[in-house]
Amino acid sequence: MIKNDIKNLACWFGGVFLFICCLGLLVEPQRAGKKMAEASQSIASSQSTEGEETRTEATARSSKTMEEKQEVMEQDLPTMEALGLSYDYANMTLPQVVQTYMDDMGIDPSQISFSYKDLTSGQTYAMNDTQSMTAGSTYKLPLNMLVVDEVAAGKLSLEERFDITNTSYEYKGEHDNYVAAFNGAMSIPDMQEYSLVYSENTPAYALAERLGGMDKAYSMFGRYGRSKAKVKTISRENKTTTDYYIQVLEYLWNNQEKYKDILYFIGVSFPGEYYKRYLYDLTIYQKPGYVREALNVDAIVMEEKPYIVALYTAYLGGSTEASEEISGVGIDQVGQIAYIINEWHRVNMN
């Protein structure tokens, strides 16, 4: 009896052991498969993130649902329709929306260059960002930053007034007016204000003299970034790329306290024009640049989630290298593109 009980018990344990072994054989492949799937997902996620960080037309990294995007679209629809700028912002990338507008306006793809970066997520978009564009007066922003660096290093004083009677100039009449208005000498804060708020040339040349002249100043622009294009910063021929300038804006953003005076001046510059033309009740720090065929603007836009944008254009409104006046059509189109970029940001990123 006891022998039979032991035998039965041994058989029972053997059956249980065999069942566990079989179960293990079934479960282990599932675990292995799950680990392989997780590894594949991790690799795919890593590749996706890497792609998004480059300036491509990748899908925006936005946590907003389609319902949330449509809600903003409906809220902003009256303004969109009034401006004639109703586009499918929620279902298009930023370059796609801008390209659609350009197609509607008959603007050639080569006429627009921009770089955009959302400062919260790091999402970037660009169009023709390595294409050489005429910089206009946008060089005056990094020029002012260089002078602030010298002041911070104790090499220049904000109180001292510097002689401007022999300063280089582009227009003699403007130069003579400044000499008369400031009794032949300007302080650095005066130079900053008039070169940034009003984008005047004489105070910009006076700032450059504090650094050793324009050639020396231009050679230092690489402090704030370098483009992957042939033109690395801003050339002495007044050419640049948005790939470079977006780095200048990010450097400015990351050092706001140091450059607070610059931010103030570009914050009050050109009210109702350039990036501010159709964007009301919104704080915008902008440095426009106009010369001949070029109408440009570089901006830090204080939306709910701030972003930076470098927008450069050529030949808008029929302007040419021989143009001496700003094209009314061209300046309006710059404002419309600014609205489109901002609306896309509101819908997808805010």
Q: For each of these PLM feature ranges, what is it?
A:
Residues 2-106, 124, 209, 215, ...:
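Structured C-terminal helix/loop/strand segments within mature extracytoplasmic catalytic/sensor domains
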Residues 78, 82-94, 166-167, 180-258:
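Active-site-adjacent helix/loop patches that line small-molecule binding or acyl-intermediate pockets
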